[in-house]
Amino acid sequence: MQDEAMRRSGANSPAGDSLADRWRAARPPVAGLHLDSAACSRQSFAALDAAAQHARHEAEVGGYVAAEAAAAVLDAGRAAVAALSGLPDAEVVFTTGSLHALDLLLGSWPGENRTLACLPGEYGPNLAVMAAHGFDVRPLPTLQDGRVALDDAAFMLADDPPDLVHLTVVASHRGVAQPLAMVAQLCTELKLPLVVDAAQGLGHVDCAVGADVTYASSRKWIAGPRGVGVLAVRPELMERLRARLPAPDWMPPLTVAQQLGFGEANVAARVGFSVALGEHLACGPQAIRARLAELGDIARTVLADVSGWRVVEAVDEPSAITTLAPIDGADPAAVRAWLLSQRRIVTTYAGVERAPLELPAPVLRISPHVDNTADDLDAFAEALVAATAATSGER
């Protein structure tokens, strides 16, 4: 079965091997088995060194002088995000992460009407931010696998248009890739602003659809530092936003983007993120996406027959994430802990708070990056069998 999956996916192709080897060689050796890139990928030597070098430069010349010297690197990072979002003229603001980006956006949204349409499987913390800013959330219609039902969504959005459509392109609790390009086209036709949560999408699936807003994190598939994110906004929309903390009259004039980005910042982390973005572009976004989809195919095939678990995604889902739903009483939290303590395998336990309007029970998630191999996934499958058996008495 595994051989068939590998033949179908081409995971042993020279191109795949070259990318995997290049990605692996660019990073410190892994301590164990890392299958958790949807949570936090492993940074490269270049990203680590760039952040450290900037921090040293701050110590040498002062933080503000060092920040001025880093302007070109940060501009390159912004340009990379704009390109990966399909909006070359986007105004890009660095944030501390995806949730911060959404908070900045919704806190600055113009007008008094506050309605948005999003998937029933929306990320729990996103729902909290939406509620905090007074947005009325309307669920988009979906298919059985959680993918947006385009025809039904078109009718709903045309019949009663919300102020914006918010689409999380890949969820936190399930590795289904939403039809982003089709949703973008629909929103354009209906003249509805489209906001894309690309926290799990940037560097993983194609996000270059020219949405009005795209926001994302550094630490996931781009493999940058923690504590950094981005908010990319179409210029026309950016000018309509009203910063929650607008610049006072006595300050020099600031653009809306400058107002949103005003405040203290870890510039070293932003430099590391910008370098990671450059590495991603150098490796080839399309090649990375193809390799990640291959690994998802292999993982789901290898894990399909593991007792005690059900693979949630279809084998050919074009993402690297495999979600394992427990059956017969398997305990995702206990299994995750056992895998880490006994085999040094890093995975994610996803509780119902990840998608409180949809997820009925906790799940286990794996998310290999391009340097992982079929042997890694075989090793995980064997360890999962052992972990399930070892923790069966803990229920």
Swiss-Prot record:
Function field: Probably catalyzes the conversion of hercynylcysteine sulfoxide to ergothioneine. ERG is one of the major redox buffers which protects bacteria against redox stressors and antibiotics; loss of ERG or mycothiol (MSH, the other major redox buffer in this bacteria) leads to respiratory alterations and bioenergetic deficiencies that negatively impact virulence.
Protein family (similarity comment): Belongs to the class-V pyridoxal-phosphate-dependent aminotransferase family. EgtE subfamily.
Pathway: Amino-acid biosynthesis; ergothioneine biosynthesis
InterPro entries associated with the record: Aminotrans_V_dom, EgtE, PyrdxlP-dep_Trfase, PyrdxlP-dep_Trfase_major, PyrdxlP-dep_Trfase_small
One example GO MF annotation: hercynylcysteine sulfoxide lyase activity (ergothioneine-forming)
Top-rank lineage group of the source organism: Bacteria
Region Disordered, residue ranges: 1-21
Residues with N6-(pyridoxal phosphate)lysine modification: 220
EC annotation from Swiss-Prot or TrEMBL: 4.4.-.-
Keyword 4Fe-4S: no
Cofactor(s) required, per the database record: pyridoxal 5'-phosphate
Identification of the protein by name: Probable hercynylcysteine sulfoxide lyase
HAMAP family recorded: EgtE
NCBIfam families cross-referenced by the UniProt entry: egtE_PLP_lyase
Gene that this sequence comes from: egtE
Uppermost EC category: lyase
Catalytic activity: S-(hercyn-2-yl)-L-cysteine S-oxide + AH2 + H(+) = ergothioneine + pyruvate + A + NH4(+)
Alphabetical keyword list: Lyase, Pyridoxal phosphate
Induction remark: Not part of the egtA-egtB-egtC-egtD operon.
